[in-house]
Structures are given as C-alpha cells and as structure tokens.
Curated annotation (Swiss-Prot):
Residues 1-66 form the LCN-type CS-alpha/beta domain. The keyword Nucleus does not apply. This is Beta-toxin Cl13. The lineage of its organism: Eukaryota, Metazoa, Ecdysozoa, Arthropoda, Chelicerata. Has the structural arrangement of an alpha-helix connected to antiparallel beta-sheets by disulfide bonds (CS-alpha/beta).
Length: 68
C-alpha cells in the first residue's frame, strides 16, 4: 500500500518543500509506519510506500483538512 502521510489530528497531509528523494519524508514515514517504509516528496506532500494494507493514509474519513 502507499499514500500520503496524514496528521490524525488535523486531517492534513505532511507538507515538504524538496521534491523527490527527501530525508524528512523517509524519516516521518518510518516513524509512523515501520522501518521498511519509504517516503519521498510528491506534489509538496510526503508520499509513503511499502506500507501494510491497514495503514491509515490521506484522506481521513470524516476529517477534512481546514485551510490547506
């Protein structure tokens, strides 16, 4: 599974500035999911890959990001 890393409290994606390979996105994807996950910056948000099938990614059901 893959998808955008999401903040559970706000419903917003984790933003990033450096497109492509991005240490911040790799670190955040691994912290949220597990060490074999990978991440990169796609469309200015962290995209995580190699996730388990039940991983929660953006968009969250019944939770909209306000103002972003």
């Amino acid at each position: 599974k893959e998808g955008y890393l999401v903040d559970y409290h706000t419903g917003c994606k984790y933003t990033c500035a450096k497109l492509g390979d991005n240490d911040y996105c790799v670190r955040e994807c691994r912290l949220r999911y597990y060490q074999s996950a990978h991440g990169y910056c796609y469309a200015f948000a962290c995209w995580c890959t190699h996730l388990y099938e039940q991983a929660v990614v953006w968009p969250l059901p019944n939770k909209r990001c306000k103002g972003k």
